[in-house]
């Protein structure tokens, strides 16, 4: 029997005792603001405490957006004043590090834009699968004078190599499904019509296995592959410094004047849009 716990921006659904799905649902653009972080943190704590959970799939209910960038119209202090998490990191990077270390398997099902924070969640997950036609991944921050805060500078080089990581981060461009697969940014790019069934079958299969074996295999892979927390913390600190710089504020205002944070072309083609801002 399925049970569901709902909250306005993040929903947790249990398909099986061992298999859960987390749905991001903050229309129209699936922006990440302070309230999203608060709700996501509560769900992470619930999942960590559930000894039955073996696999969690992360997906979106908002057409066109897996999870988008931060909400630049929200008060920054509402985010920075959130308490540090159990890792000792600030609230957002704490969630991502806990997700990577959790004793269950995390899978990102990417349909639509995974921009900034959405890309950071995909990088924190154990696996990610993208819609060939509809997925777009982006670390867009440098294009507006920012440094990303959720750890992509620490994670991407280990995942796709230094040179490709620098291309993704410094171009601030959109990376579509097939190129993301070729770079190793995602596990696979699949036809959109096949994506849901593939991810569900994989999650159901993993959920049928022994949790001790799953958790210990993941723990040992983590020990061989994850960046230390100090690298994640350094990225967050650089992000917070970058937000207050005049250069970043000017570029963000210029984007807002063109339609940023509203449904439309600027958000749909954010990589192109930041490239039009000029020097």
Give the label of every model feature segment.
Residues 95, 109, 115-169, 198, ...:
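CoA-thioester-processing core
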Residues 129-130, 186-198:
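Short acidic-hydrophobic, aromatic-tinged amphipathic segments that line or gate anion-handling sites
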Residues 91-106:
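A structural motif corresponding to the C-terminal end of an alpha-helix
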Residues 1-17, 63-65, 172, 176-177, ...:
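C-terminal alpha-helix plus adjacent terminal tail
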Residues 1-59, 97, 278:
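Conserved CoA-thioester-binding segment of acyl-CoA-metabolizing enzymes
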Residues 103, 125-126, 186:
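Short, well-ordered alpha-helix to beta-strand connector turns
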């Amino acid at each position: 029997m399925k049970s569901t716990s709902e909250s306005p921006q993040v929903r947790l659904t249990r398909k099986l005792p061992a298999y859960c799905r987390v749905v991001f649902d903050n229309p129209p653009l699936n922006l990440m603001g302070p309230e999203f972080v608060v709700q996501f943190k509560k769900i992470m704590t619930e999942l960590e405490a559930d000894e039955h959970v073996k696999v969690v799939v992360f997906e979106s209910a908002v057409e066109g957006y897996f999870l988008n960038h931060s909400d630049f119209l929200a008060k920054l202090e509402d985010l920075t004043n959130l308490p540090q998490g159990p890792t000792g990191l600030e609230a957002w990077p704490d969630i991502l590090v806990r997700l990577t270390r959790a004793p269950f398997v995390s899978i990102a099902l990417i349909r639509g834009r995974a921009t900034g924070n959405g890309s950071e969640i995909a990088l924190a997950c154990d696996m990610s699968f993208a819609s060939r036609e509809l997925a777009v991944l982006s670390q867009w921050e440098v294009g507006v004078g920012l440094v990303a805060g959720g750890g992509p500078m620490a994670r991407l080089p280990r995942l796709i190599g230094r040179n490709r990581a620098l291309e993704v981060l410094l171009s601030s461009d959109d990376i579509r499904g097939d190129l993301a697969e070729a770079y190793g940014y995602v596990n696979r790019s699949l036809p959109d019509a096949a994506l849901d069934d593939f991810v569900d079958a994989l999650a159901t299969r993993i959920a049928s296995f022994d949790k001790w074996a799953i958790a210990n295999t993941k723990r040992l892979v983590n020990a061989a592959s994850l960046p230390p927390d100090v690298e994640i913390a350094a990225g967050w600190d650089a992000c917070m410094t970058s937000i207050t710089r005049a250069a970043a504020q000017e570029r963000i205002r210029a984007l807002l004047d063109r339609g940023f944070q509203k449904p439309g072309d600027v958000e749909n083609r954010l990589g192109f849009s930041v490239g039009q801002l000029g020097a």
